[in-house]
Amino acid sequence: MDVTAKYELIGLMAYPIRHSLSPEMQNKALEKAGLPFTYMAFEVDNDSFPAAIEGLKALKMRGTGVSMPNKQLACEYVDELTPAAKLVGAINTIVNDDGYLRGYNTDGTGHIRAIKESGFDIKGKTMVLLGAGGASTAIGAQGAIEGLKEIKLFNRRDEFFDKALAFAQRVNENTDCVVTVTDLADQQAFAEALASADILTNGTKVGMKPLENESLVNDISLLHPGLLVTECVYNPHMTKLLQQAQQAGCKTIDGYGMLLWQGAEQFTLWTGKDFPLEYVKQVMGFGA
């Protein structure tokens, strides 16, 4: 790829960032489509995020992806949020239109799309959702919008717990889905929720390096063959949770599905063009 002075810059702001496959995936897609953009990753934490957004405007960047730990904070630095992003309370995509910043969340649509592409119909189903960060709440919100009957959200009593309660209230007030929030330390409630669940989704970083030997499911007998287990983590590709699920006879969806579909939507938001899906799946080895 020969970058010229006509190229526009798209970023990814997160910390840590060096594990991300998004720059490789997006640049392969941009090159295949012959579009004058280049995508770069920047290590940006909460403290440096405000300055990074000012830099985005000053450099007239086309936009940026936003990942941990900035997804919720980023909502405060855009001029407009989509209705779904307001429901989530977090964004993973910023589009810069001549200094006017629009915030989107493609995590939820990407993950739910991956589930649908597997042939699973979420309408009327119950999901056990682990975590209350930006990715997890995006998945929950989009699932509620698209027909989930119930979401049982489990999170530790950490800094995200009150945010989880606020998220549940927003979804309960604006959709037909019923969301409850329970402390993950209540293992009896967790076991009962899994017994009646159709989907278990990990929206936390547990399972991602350096936590690759950990899972929030402490007892594999809680997983049953009728359960669909989905993962947001893609590094490593096969997390401990997915290994447990396969041993228990569950159908599984790895983190590549969400990465691919959320990235495809981001690509279109930034460029206005279709994402070369099959090409990217092939060159990135997704689904192989």
Swiss-Prot record:
HAMAP family (UniProt xref): Shikimate_DH_AroE, Shikimate_DH_YdiB
Function noted in UniProt: The actual biological function of YdiB remains unclear, nor is it known whether 3-dehydroshikimate or quinate represents the natural substrate. Catalyzes the reversible NAD-dependent reduction of both 3-dehydroshikimate (DHSA) and 3-dehydroquinate to yield shikimate (SA) and quinate, respectively. It can use both NAD or NADP for catalysis, however it has higher catalytic efficiency with NAD.
Upper lineage: Bacteria, Pseudomonadati, Pseudomonadota, Gammaproteobacteria, Enterobacterales
Coiled-coil stretches noted in the UniProt entry, renumbered to this chain: none
GO BP terms in the entry: amino acid biosynthetic process; aromatic amino acid family biosynthetic process; chorismate biosynthetic process; shikimate metabolic process
EC number annotated for this UniProt entry: 1.1.1.282
Keyword Iron-sulfur: no
Pfam family, one: SDH_C
Similarity annotation: Belongs to the shikimate dehydrogenase family.
Enzyme kind, highest EC tier: oxidoreductase
UniProt gene name: ydiB
Protein name: Quinate/shikimate dehydrogenase
Subunit structure, as described in the record: Homodimer.
Pathway info: Metabolic intermediate biosynthesis; chorismate biosynthesis; chorismate from D-erythrose 4-phosphate and phosphoenolpyruvate: step 4/7
